Swiss-Prot record:
GO terms for cellular component: small ribosomal subunit. InterPro entries: Ribosomal_uS2, Ribosomal_uS2_arc, Ribosomal_uS2_CS, Ribosomal_uS2_euk/arc, Ribosomal_uS2_flav_dom_sf. This is Small ribosomal subunit protein uS2. Pfam families: Ribosomal_S2 (PF00318). It comes from the Archaea. It comes from Metallosphaera sedula (strain ATCC 51363 / DSM 5348 / JCM 9185 / NBRC 15509 / TH2). PROSITE patterns: RIBOSOMAL_S2_1 (PS00962), RIBOSOMAL_S2_2 (PS00963). GO terms for biological process: translation. GO terms for molecular function: structural constituent of ribosome. The keyword Amino-acid biosynthesis does not apply. Coiled coil: none annotated. Belongs to the universal ribosomal protein uS2 family.
């Protein structure tokens, strides 16, 4: 077990707490708590911006910020409801961080959205004379710290932005934050999988308790052998 993993281990009491709402009642998460934890969606960084403080569950003795899984789950639901209101092809999902490439591409495939991974061509959202010009109605980004070009252009065009945001995120021009570990391979896979499934549920394309035929593992970037 790495030092980072030891720093994010939760006690049984903490796990019990994370399965209860503000009034102490058991809450139903989109994904079983253990699945969230094993994927590391709650693992933050050693830095926390003022806006992201509201999503923090604990600060470990070594200074590592740990996100509240309940708030991650809640924002996934809110984001899914919001994104489900748009026509699939009007949703643009982008990722400049390599670990997000496969999750974004699979997400787009499942929900019918567009995907742009890697370097985004400047002017893609703002220059109608550009060959790659597109006009999305909403933008989903994997990391506000690395997807800055997309966020800036969306802001210039009045396009709402939904962003997976770690504890160190600067969320200027982001309209809806999904607190999350947006740097981990398994975390990104689970987050995009859960969001895709919930969007289909919100659209009533699948039953409220149904799964999608694509497994979480298929959303995960495969490490080179």
């Amino acid at each position: 077990m790495s030092e980072n993993e030891r720093g994010t281990q939760l006690t049984e009491e903490e796990k019990e707490e994370l399965q209860r709402g503000e009034k102490g009642a058991i809450i139903e998460l989109l994904v079983p708590l253990e699945n969230y934890l094993s994927a590391g969606v709650h693992i933050g960084t050693h830095t926390c911006t003022r806006y992201m403080e509201r999503f923090i569950y604990r600060v470990r003795p070594e200074g590592l910020y740990v996100l509240d899984v309940r708030k991650i789950d809640e924002r996934l639901r809110v984001a899914a409801k919001f994104l489900s209101r748009f026509q699939p092809q009007s949703i643009l999902a982008v990722a400049s961080r390599p670990y997000a490439f496969t999750p974004v591409q699979k997400f787009a495939e499942v929900v019918g959205a567009r995907a742009v991974v890697g370097r985004m061509v400047p002017g893609m959202l703002t220059n109608p004379y550009l060959e790659d010009f597109i006009e999305p109605e909403v933008l989903l980004v994997s990391d506000p710290r690395t997807d800055t070009q997309a966020i800036k252009e969306a802001a210039d065009m009045g396009i709402p932005v939904v962003a997976f945001s770690d504890t160190d995120a600067k969320v200027d021009y982001v309209d809806l934050v999904i607190p999350s570990n947006n740097k981990g391979r398994k975390s990104l896979a689970l987050l995009y999988w859960a969001l895709a499934r919930q969007i289909l549920r919100e659209r009533k394309e699948i039953a409220p308790d149904a799964d999608i035929p694509v497994k979480v593992e298929e959303f995960e970037v495969k490490l080179s052998q």
